[in-house]
Curated annotation (Swiss-Prot):
This is Photosystem II protein D1. Chlorophyll a PD1 binds at residue 198. It comes from the Eukaryota. Residues 345-353 form a propeptide. Chlorophyll a ChlzD1 binds at residue 118. [CaMn4O5] cluster binds at residues 170, 189, 332-333, 342, 344. The keyword ATP-binding does not apply. The lineage of its organism: Eukaryota, Viridiplantae, Streptophyta, Embryophyta, Tracheophyta. The chain crosses the membrane at residues 29-46, 118-133, 142-156, 197-218, 274-288. It comes from Amborella trichopoda.
Amino acid sequence: MTAILERRESTSLWGRFCNWITSTENRLYIGWFGVLMIPTLLTATSVFIIAFIAAPPVDIDGIREPVSGSLLYGNNILSGAIIPTSAAIGLHFYPIWEAASVDEWLYNGGPYELIVLHFLLSVACYMGREWELSFRLGMRPWIAVAYSAPVAAATAVFLIYPIGQGSFSDGMPLGISGIFNLMIVFQAEHNILMHPFHMLGVAGVFGGSLFSAMHGSLVTSSLIRETTENESANAGYRFGQEEETYNIVAAHGYFGRLIFQYASFNNSRSLHFFLAAWPVVGIWFTALGISTMAFNLNGFNFNQSVVDSQGRVINTWADIINRANLGMEVMHERNAHNFPLDLAAVEAPSTNG
């Protein structure tokens, strides 16, 4: 008789902690990226909620005219926002300990920089966490690649654009009205609607919505019935079953007859790759467009009106867009400068008399 004795390996506290962090058996996977994601996301969320409710007005333009953004200072859910850090701070790193007092930090919009930097770090870690979980489960990494599109867009708006413009005060205010404010100012200063990368982004977002709706409706309409006509089609399936639940050939045939034969996919993998790639590539281009316009590589402009042989202006749609842009720029930071930069940079025309 042979007895085999095995020595029980003692696992250190650090080893047990590492196993728990990287375990795929947890209800929610943590991962090493999650170790950084959780505190940064909680910090950004907590400060956002507190500042949205109670932050005092912020001197966004650096001209001693503070702007209110919180609920307790007269705003509602629609008009409220976290006001960006003051132009007086520019791009300086502005933690609480850099200010003479907490009141000064709040007056200069310190919470905005704190929220944005923690938020960007947390969403980047969330993307890394997606890759980490995919790796440990033996999956391919494309979920994290797809998520990189909104991460790139957020980074472009909250970090690259302020860097290009020279101040965090040019960042997007964190609120519903703040989003619209950035859109209007962006159009006025960069003519974003005439930028080809923005056009690709619009095609990606709206096209992705259209394709998702088409795909979902086709799948739902071509289920393989496992029940009688008197029972719900849903009763014939169980969650996670290996058998196909819908007939892609039927869906392909329907769509091919509805438009034309080659407008539909007969391969499920090709179809789902297309559904993922279309909006992701579009949003990548939008983020790239924001990043280039941050350094004033703007959309197409038609600042010179079309004139006839007599020198008379032929009014075009471009003239209307130009006037709208100038009007929006006049209203933006109206107390910080008297004229839009486009007008202030041009010499005054000479007049006879």
